[in-house]
Swiss-Prot record:
Source species, domain of life: Bacteria
One GO CC annotation: plasma membrane
Keywords: Cell membrane, Membrane, Transmembrane, Transmembrane helix
Species per Swiss-Prot/TrEMBL record: Staphylococcus aureus (strain USA300)
Name of this protein: Uncharacterized protein SAUSA300_0205
Amino acid sequence: MKAHKIFWLNLAAIIIISIVVSGDMFLAMKWEQIHLKDGLKKVLSTYPIKNLETLYEIDGHDNPHYENNDQDTWYIESSYSVVGSDELLKEDRMLLKVDKNTHKITGEYDTTTNDKKNATDSTYKSYPVKVVNNKIVFTKDVKDPALKQKIENNQFLIQSGDLTSILNSNDLKVTHDPTTDYYNLSGKLSNDNPNVKQLKRRYNIPKNASTKVELKGMSDLKGNNHQDQKLYFYFSSPGKDQIIYKESLTYNKISEH
């Protein structure tokens, strides 16, 4: 009888310890996510950059090996893609190069269209652009008024979005490697998120489409300066082709020596 009692006492102790340890692990993981979200909030709060020309005066990640006469360049890229079953059907892409030395922003707007019935039948067009007084203008004449208006009114989420609102979602997972400063955020966003609303309105995406988000980049999560980052939005609707919006901001510092 005594041995039987000891057995149950030991079992109860093991269960209690397991519950306490599991609870501590859960709280530790929850606290880590809160801490990482706070760090990402510092990074994302440096946006929006409403005037792209202010990037002339903004430095990216620091590197002591570079000299003062290095060529500093920001690259801003966005793309809107319609993807069928393992194939790209349509893509519109804007790429801008912000030269901090010459104080010039140049780039191109590309369109790619693939025929769903004939994979070899694709159309690619490219339109050179530049930015003057924070407005995108063509460097060559474009006769299509609708396309011209579409490109000239183009804005990046880093200009007009509310990136910190992404962190309000309860369905997010954030990881950060302090050794490399690489971070990754992934999860789902509701239709009420202002960035989701803006993209759906801009690209005529179905209102009921579900949205997944992914954010990748390099940062110490202290928000000291703008860092390289890539942002992805995945829109899915039953029976519809998937729509992907990508946007990236990268900094390139090339030594002349």
